[in-house]
Amino acid sequence: MTDSTIRDVMTAEPEARATPFEMATRDFLFGNVWSRPGLSRRDRRWVTLTCVAAADAPQPIEDHVYAAMKSGDIVFDEMLEFVLQFAVYCGWPKGSHVEGVARQQWARVHSERGEAAPPWPALASASLGDNDWEQRLRRGEQEFRDVNLVSAPPRDTPYNQAGILNFVFGHVWQRPGLSRRDRRIITVACVGIDDSPLPIMSHVGSALESGDLTIAEMREIILHFSAYYGFPKAEQLDRTATDAWARITSRQQKT
């Protein structure tokens, strides 16, 4: 059963395991975590890709980008949307590296099929959204409210106006290439990595309160995250999820 999970996830034959790390990878990571039914394999791909991309380990990045696309769990256009969402929350240099890997592994997948990778299409300017700045900012404010379930910040700093309202919520969160739920999963993993208390509270809480993620799914995301980025960071996510869910259920009971 475990070997079958490895084949399905990594799209490769299992290797011999000798060290404690290798044995734990087989028995715990694939035998327990990846095989759990609480999330789809695609959902787990998003958490894993976020973690390995942030960890800067070249081989795991290559392995998981390749496997995600070869398996068909994530198509190439979705991988590129992931890169953009990831870059927003974990930084442009890391995003640049993952995009380079995506290009290489996309070509590899096609090469293994005996095909030439098709040329990249030029993206239309219209895909950038509204170029009326006032309309864009208003739409960004609304998207911020829809995603975070709180009031939008004032347009009083470059970070808020140009960054949060114009770009992150005025454009990225509105792009059609991924569902809001996909972006929630990626973002929760990113803020867990980044260690910033307010974004962790905001994104974990709003993912649960919106209903985009159930508490059971959030628990599974946190377990999967802990396997790829560490139990201490996951502990903070778990505490935040517990506190957020207690507040949500308390409010529901009062209504």
PLM regions and their residue ranges:
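Acidic, glycine/proline-rich low-complexity segments that act as flexible tails and inter-domain linkers
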Residues: 1-42, 54-55, 63, 70, ...
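Short, structured motif recognition centered on aromatic/hydrophobic residues
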Residues: 44-52, 82-83, 183-191, 221-222
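A cross-kingdom feature marking solvent-exposed beta-strand/loop segments within repeated
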Residues: 35, 39, 48-49, 60-85, ...
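Short, thiol/selenol-centered motifs that function as redox-active sites or metal-ligating centers
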Residues: 53-60, 192-199
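Long compositionally biased, domain-poor regions of proteins
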Residues: 93, 164-170, 194-205, 217-236
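Phosphate/ribose-phosphate-bearing ligand recognition and processing surfaces
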Residues: 88
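N-terminal alpha-helical segment
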Residues: 26, 43, 61, 79, ...
